[in-house]
Structure formats: structure tokens, C-alpha cells
Amino acid sequence: MAEMQDYKQSLKYETFSYLPPMNAERIRAQIKYAIAQGWSPGIEHVEVKNSMNQYWYMWKLPFFGEQNVDNVLAEIEACRSAYPTHQVKLVAYDNYAQSLGLAFVVYRGN
């Protein structure tokens, strides 16, 4: 009989969770794509122990009309600095469809 092994897994929050972790260049490309689609970026964060809850805290308001990727990246870093143990997620709101166009975790916390 085969020996049973522990199946190592991590929590999956969105589609990109199944891919290797994103580097800064790939995160920048996703933000650029969201802005090019006309979506409004926003940042959410939550404690790691509560990360499977439906509600994540908003970091400020969504950045309606934001066209500068660097401003969004700066806000992600500000959120990460303010809450170093929290998970930080980028969301992009599609105003036309009134739904999320994009959402992924950019920082998994400590």
C-alpha cells in the first residue's frame, strides 16, 4: 500500500493564485491593463486570519479616473506599510458593467 503524504496547499483567493507569484513588473502590467479598460482601481486589505471572509476593508476610496499606474502602486505600498501583517488586494471596478473587472492579491502579509 502506498504511503499517505500530506498535501501541501495554500489558500486561493482569485485566478492568479494558481500561478507563480507576480513580480513588480507583472503587477504593474495588470494595473496598466485595468486602467486601459477604463476601470477604477481600488485597494482592499484584511487580516490574514479573516482573509476568507467576504468583507475586506477598503483602503481609502476607489481611484475613480486615475490614469497613472505609479499613483496606484504608491497607494498599494502605503497600505502595505500601514498594515504590514494584512493581505492587500487590488480590485478594479468596471463602471459600465457595475461589477469587478479584476481582483487579485498583491501582498499576502506576514
UniProtKB/Swiss-Prot annotation:
Family matches, as CDD domains: RuBisCO_small (cd03527)
Biotechnology remark: Expression of 10 genes for alpha-carboxysome (Cb) proteins (cbbL-cbbS-csoS2-csoS3-csoS4A-csoS4B-csoS1C-csoS1A-csoS1B-csoS1D) in E.coli generates compartments that resemble Cb, contain RuBisCO and have its catalytic activity, showing it is possible to make artificial, functional Cb using these 10 genes. Cargo proteins can be targeted to these organelles. Alpha-carboxysomes are assembled in the complete absence of this enzyme in this bacteria, suggesting carboxysome-based microcompartments can be designed for applications such as custom chemical reactors or delivery vehicles.
Main location: other
Disruption phenotype: A double ccbL-ccbS deletion does not grow in air, grows well with 5% CO(2), a high-CO(2) requiring phenotype (hcr) and forms empty but otherwise normal appearing carboxysomes. Required for growth in ambient air.
GO MF: ribulose-bisphosphate carboxylase activity
A Gene Ontology BP annotation from the UniProt entry: reductive pentose-phosphate cycle
Keywords: Bacterial microcompartment, Calvin cycle, Carbon dioxide fixation, Carboxysome
Protein's UniProt keywords contain Nucleus: no
Cysteines joined through disulfide linkages: none
Subunit structure: Heterohexadecamer of 8 large and 8 small subunits. Interacts with CsoS2. Forms a CsoS2-CsoS1-RuBisCO complex. Holo-RuBisCO interacts with the N-terminal repeats of CsoS2; binding is sensitive to ionic strength. A fusion of a single N-terminal repeat to the C-terminus of the large subunit of RuBisCO (cbbL) shows the repeat can lie between a CbbL dimer, making minor contacts to CbbS; thus each RuBisCO holoenzyme could bind 8 repeats.
Protein name listed in UniProt: Ribulose bisphosphate carboxylase small subunit
Gene source species: Halothiobacillus neapolitanus (strain ATCC 23641 / c2) (Thiobacillus neapolitanus)
Gene name linked to the record: cbbS
